[in-house]
Amino acid sequence: MSRRNISKKRFPETDAIYNSYLVSLLISRILKSGKKTIAKKIVYQAFDIIKKKTNEDPLTVFEKAIRNASPIVEVKARRVGGSTYQVPVEVTGFRATNLSLRWIIRYGDQRVGRSMAIKLANEIIDTANDIGNTIKKKEETHKMAEANKAFAHFRY
């Protein structure tokens, strides 16, 4: 194990409009080829669409979607005695947030629609209402962990 100092966890700065670091995490996940202004435009347009469709604060809808999509347990591959086991492991808070953001963006992008802003807004709204592909992915992850509960003693 390294004797060097442990690096500190760095959080991105909060975004300008909503003053939320979750929104800035979303912007940085949508980012492609370093084009941050386009990513910001997509996110803010999606939030405007959410506001029009739900008549609620888009930040609260987004936070609710993140909470609904965050997994509690996941499986990790662990090699023991020549065979690999899927070991259920609890998910930390930061990783749960990252996974939910990743899933929301992935399944939003896979939706049928014209612009990424519309697709992202619809996925966030569906996730906040506990429906959609993101919630299916979370439930699938939980089912995998439940099915492999017998290997929990291999946890590391």
Swiss-Prot record:
Species the sequence originates in: Phaeodactylum tricornutum (strain CCAP 1055/1)
Name listed for the protein in its UniProt record: Small ribosomal subunit protein uS7c
Oligomeric and partner information: Part of the 30S ribosomal subunit.
One GO cellular component term noted in the UniProt record for this chain: chloroplast
PROSITE patterns in alphabetical order: RIBOSOMAL_S7 (PS00052)
Keywords from the named record: Chloroplast, Plastid, Ribonucleoprotein, Ribosomal protein, RNA-binding, rRNA-binding
Transmembrane region(s): none
Taxonomic path: Eukaryota, Sar, Stramenopiles, Ochrophyta, Bacillariophyta
InterPro entries for the chain: Ribosomal_uS7, Ribosomal_uS7_bac/org-type, Ribosomal_uS7_CS, Ribosomal_uS7_dom, Ribosomal_uS7_dom_sf
Pfam families (alphabetical): Ribosomal_S7
Molecular functions (GO terms): rRNA binding; structural constituent of ribosome
Protein family according to the UniProt entry: Belongs to the universal ribosomal protein uS7 family.
Disulphide connectivity of cysteines: none
Subcellular localization, as worded in the UniProt entry: Plastid, Chloroplast
Highest taxon in the source lineage: Eukaryota
Main function: One of the primary rRNA binding proteins, it binds directly to 16S rRNA where it nucleates assembly of the head domain of the 30S subunit.
GO biological process: translation
